Every structure is written in C-alpha cells, then in structure tokens.
Amino acid sequence: MLRYIFFAAILFFVFPNTESAGFLKFELTADRDCLLHLEHSSTYSETVRLLAYESRPLEIYTQGSINEIPVHFQLLHHFSGKALSEAKFQIFQLKNNGLWDSKVIDTDKVILSVRSTFYCENGYFGPICDRRSRTFAPKSDIQTSTPGYQTQVLKFDFKISDDIIIYSSLAFFVLLLIIFNCILCCYRPKKSQKYLDVSLGSPKVFSICGYSADKSGNTTEYLDAPSRFFSSTKIECVV
C-alpha cells in the first residue's frame, strides 16, 4: 500500500500541471489615419488610433495551455468611428522562437500591416513558455566607516528550472523508497534454522570398555574412546 502512495506522489511531482504565459506583441502600420478595434475572446478588447505609416506597438497577454489564438481586427474611421471594414480574424502562433510573422489585411479603404512575435512572461521559458523558473537574487552591501566608500560583497543571480526540480523530487522519492525497503528488511523477524551436515554421516556411539587378549605369549591391549563424530583407538602392545 505504501508503495502505491510513493508512486502516486512521484507522478504528482514529476508531471505537474503547467500552463504557458507570455505576450503576443504586435507592430501595427496603416496607410492612412484610422482606428483599429481588436478583440480576443471575451478577455481582451481594445481600440487604438493609428497614424498613417507610423508603427504602433501593442501587446496581448496570454495564459493557458494553448498554442495559438485568434484575434479579431476591425478598421474604423479615425474621427466618426464608422466601420471601414468588416471584422476579420487572424490566427497567431504562440511560439517563443524570436521570429516575427507578417500579415496584411487589405480592405477597400485601408491597408493594415500586422507584424507579430511571441515572448515569455518573466519567470517562464521554453518553446511555448510553459516552463517555470525560479530566480534567486540575494544582495548584500557592506559599508565601511570610510565616508563615500562602499563595497558590494555579494551579488549573484541563478535560476532553477522545472527540470531540476522534477529530477530532484524523483531522486528524493526513490531514495526514500530504498530506505523504507531497507528498514523493512532489517526489522523482519528472524527464523531459527537448523542445518544438518550430511557429509558426517550418522553419529556413532562407542562404549568405554577395556579388554586384553593374549596370543602366543604376546599381550595386546585395546582402548576405545567415545566421540560424537569419530572414534579413535589406542593400541598398546606388550611383548
């Protein structure tokens, strides 16, 4: 049961729910003065003024597990706000590759050039900005007693990516699982076992007895000693 809990915890930390976060940046240029109304779903709606042949930067914040977004464009008269064209939507890819994509919206009265690129929000990185990074920037300044003299002792920045956190969590839980198994093996009750060495054969029992025999004037005395595993015989001859 505990192993299933460990595996579930590992899966939770190794495969966390992540979402992308970044900005879709536009450079808008029209060939005449006009108003441009932009809409993205129900979360974004804005109207900006464009001057003839002047680029206007604009950014749309995006968040979620998406790879592309549709944006509606509608050109309006710069003074009355009357529609100069129907609302048209364009689809933009959310790829953090540093490249600019160009589109042209051509109407009867206004030609609109749309250049777009996508970049990550601070703290995110990756091809679609779906990986988080944690930045640590501890700073410490030490001032000496000498007026006008300051010494900066420590200033460093480093990032810990999601991959490092994932691998560290996985290694920690694997180590914890190994320790748990070792504890189970150490505290397992020991069973007494008896071993019988079959190579020794069945034990022999000898009785302690002494006897002598006379033959042809010679006396031979035999003494037997008991032993559990072997027997020894001492022979003494008296001539």
UniProtKB/Swiss-Prot annotation:
Name of protein: Skn-1 dependent zygotic transcript 1 protein
Keyword Magnesium in annotation: no
Biological function: May have a role in mesendoderm development during embryogenesis.
Keywords: Developmental protein
Gene Ontology annotations of biological process type: mesendoderm development
Membrane-crossing residue ranges in chain numbering: none
Organism the protein comes from: Caenorhabditis elegans
Tissues and organs where the protein is expressed, per its UniProt entry: Expressed in mesendodermal precursor cells of embryos.
UniProt cross-references to InterPro entries, sorted A to Z: Mesendoderm_Regulator (IPR053132)
Other comments on record: Down-regulated in 12-cell embryos from mutant worms lacking skn-1.
